[in-house]
Regions:
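Conserved oxyanion/phosphate-binding beta-strand-loop segments in alpha/beta enzyme cores
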Residues: 47-54
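A gly/proline- and charged-residue-enriched helix-loop-helix capping module
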Residues: 54-91
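Active-site loop segments of alpha/beta catalytic cores
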Residues: 1-2, 12-36, 41-47, 76-250
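Outer-membrane beta-barrel proteins
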Residues: 6-9
Length: 250
């Protein structure tokens, strides 16, 4: 089912008003609330069709650019209805939290992820060689959008003890940004270094503390990231799978 902004039940997503109080603690982290994170917000704002899979409870985007003429043929590369919806939900979450939970940004995918979502992996990779100027303009545009959306969220968050709580429930002084580069899984270390690390760093510059999310299949990006002062932290998900003896038995 194709999801559009007017189909979203805002009241159901933000929940009831909570009694005011101090922020709750969950284990070693602060309690958080966030705009429904299954919605691929940045991709939707860029114009990606969003498909809601009712039985699986997930949402996916579909690339909508088969060639660069499709991208340049679009008058506006920002869907204001999705942008306004994200900001509205964020404001309501802050208002209704009662200070009991920190409102944080949903998953915001980084420039390489946005390139893969809009262009698809084939056009994305070929364009690094065949259309480098167009690709750089595209990456400039989506990186600027990332920063614009994140700044809009930061302006709406309520500070916690003079700082901000991250997506991971961890407090930091000042402001925090979380970015990611999952699409680096199909990039070589050289392509990531030559093309994408600079754009990831630009997303990190939008806050006082920056975190980048990786999967274990993207560890080849770490050397390039460690050569720069940003991000301040690298968060890695270690994918689990069969051990070597099990694989041999198969």
């Amino acid at each position: 089912m194709r999801l559009t902004p007017e189909m979203v039940d805002v009241e159901r997503l933000v929940g009831a008003v909570r009694e005011p109080g101090t922020i709750d603690i969950v284990g070693d982290t602060f309690a958080i609330v966030q705009p429904f994170t299954r919605v691929p917000w940045l991709e939707a704002i860029l114009g990606n069709p969003v498909e809601a899979l009712i039985q699986g409870g997930s949402m996916r985007t579909h690339r909508f650019v088969d060639g660069w003429e499709d991208w340049h043929g679009v008058t506006a590369h920002r869907q204001d209805a999705w942008f306004r919806l994200l900001m509205q939900i964020t404001e309501l979450l802050v208002e209704r939290s009662g200070g009991r939970a920190a409102t944080v940004a949903p998953i915001l995918r980084g420039p390489s992820d946005l390139a893969e979502a809009v262009l698809g992996p084939e056009l994305m990779i070929y364009s690094l060689y065949d259309h480098p100027d167009r690709m750089r303009r595209f990456l400039d545009e989506v990186t600027d959008l990332f920063t614009e959306v994140h700044n809009g969220l930061l302006r709406r968050f309520a500070p916690v003890a003079g700082g901000t709580v991250s997506y991971f429930g961890i407090w930091a002084p000042g402001t925090v940004v979380r970015t990611q580069c999952d699409a680096s899984a199909f990039l070589s270390a050289k392509l990531y270094r030559d093309w994408f690390v600079a754009y990831d760093l630009r997303t990190c510059e939008g806050a006082d503390t920056s975190i980048i999310h990786l999967h274990s299949c993207s560890m080849h990006t770490v050397d390039a990231l460690l050569e720069t002062p940003l991000p301040h932290a690298i968060q890695v998900i270690l994918e689990e799978g069969p051990n070597v003896p099990t694989l041999r038995a198969l």
